[in-house]
Amino acid sequence: MAKLHITTWGCQMNEYDSSKMADLLNSTHGLELTDKPEEADVLLLNTCSIREKAQEKVFSQLGRWKNWKKDKPDLIIGVGGCVASQEGEHIRDRAPFVDIVFGPQTLHRLPEMINKIRGGDRAIVDISFPEIEKFDRLPEPRAEGPTAFVSIMEGCNKYCSFCVVPYTRGEEVSRPVDDVLFEIAQLAEQGVREVNLLGQNVNAYRGETFDGGICTFAELLRLVAAIDGIDRVRYTTSHPIEFTDDIIEVYRDTPELVSFLHLPIQSGADRVLTMMKRNHTALEYKAIIRKLREVRPNIQISSDFIVGFPGETAEDFEQTMKVIEQVNFDMSFSFIYSARPGTPAADLPDDISEEEKKERLARLQQRINHQAMQFSRAMLGTEQRVLVEGPSKKDIMELTGRTENNRIVNFQGTPDMIGKFVDIKITDVYTNSLRGDVVRTEDEMGLRVVESAASVIARTRKEDDLGVGKYVVNL
């Protein structure tokens, strides 16, 4: 059987895209996924352009693959993702042995591209933005464990001054609500218990309904939570300026929506936020968190931070540290600023020394780690509901799973617990994990109800006396 290898860099959207590529090429060409690139007949590199020197990293990887192509002339090499979208034809200028260059919105065309290359075409570059077409061309979802990612939209319209996403993934396009619900219901039938809704800015979701109406993100959350078998709902990533009160109301009355939120602020200084074109202040961000904690007192918050943005003063950084303490973030993805070509911020003078940037990043991460450990220690002696993912990586005789607030818990259990929920009493707290004992199995919780995907769609559609279809969100 012919084999496929995909090297994936970057965000969860890229991970999701790579899984779809693998499923697609397995269904169309029978390609079997391998983690050994030297065995592959098709090599795909799914790239990310967020970090500094992303392009050089791509060409370095391609240089290693070039040698394999010399020994294996029929080997097909493709480059996708955000660097491909940015660079386009320039990739082949520097690496003419690359056969296919495709963007995040054209991965569904891979089967046709491969056929053309095998048919004698020299090379194909397709980095267009055909809106939502790719989701209509992908195979049915295939569950791999009790958790799954589902893309609900693509692109971003916010144009933050440091970010390449609007240029590499295009503007915001939402999937129709029926398509999203049907995919999740199919996954639930396969045993998925937790779904993570993906998008560059999920709270901008505006999905078309079957009758031409619009479903908001808050309404979508309620509909997803109503699917039997889905007992946890997460999402990533969201933007503060569209974190509206109707979303906060979902936290008030939808227990399936986890008490853990990733809401990036990037900086705690209003002056820096203005230069970043974030279009909100630190006070407005804190107001959202205050409202959330009024309806979910135990919710834990994570964020992204960019340290050393051009023009960030020592006082600006201290304001960020103050916000970190005030919000009491549980976790963060923190980076030293690096200019991305083509973004407005790339034209700003990079006036902060590398030494100063590293010192600020170390202070920020130390503070967040301290707060995270305080949250973990507070869990000692409590009961936590854990979704069991499989054997522990450290000890195959033990099981591992995650709490609602994203903590890894290791414990002694039986194989029949995998894919189900258990209640664990936390007995030990470590830097990167927790440990505990099982106090309750899922059989004692009465959680799971099996329901077909088609019936979920039927339940979300109702017709009035005149036969006009409408959605009923509060099921």
Curated annotation (Swiss-Prot):
Coiled-coil parts of chain: none
How the cofactor is bound: the record states: Binds 2 [4Fe-4S] clusters. One cluster is coordinated with 3 cysteines and an exchangeable S-adenosyl-L-methionine.
Q: Name one Pfam family in it.
A: UPF0004
What Enzyme Commission number(s) appear in the record?
2.8.4.3
Q: Which residues bind [4Fe-4S] cluster 2?
A: C156, C160, C163
Q: Name one GO molecular function term.
A: N6-isopentenyladenosine methylthiotransferase activity
The record's family statement is:
Belongs to the methylthiotransferase family. MiaB subfamily.
Its name, as the record gives it, is tRNA-2-methylthio-N(6)-dimethylallyladenosine synthase
Look up and give the organism this protein is from.
Actinobacillus pleuropneumoniae serotype 5b (strain L20)
Organism placement in taxonomy: Bacteria, Pseudomonadati, Pseudomonadota, Gammaproteobacteria, Pasteurellales
Gene name?
miaB
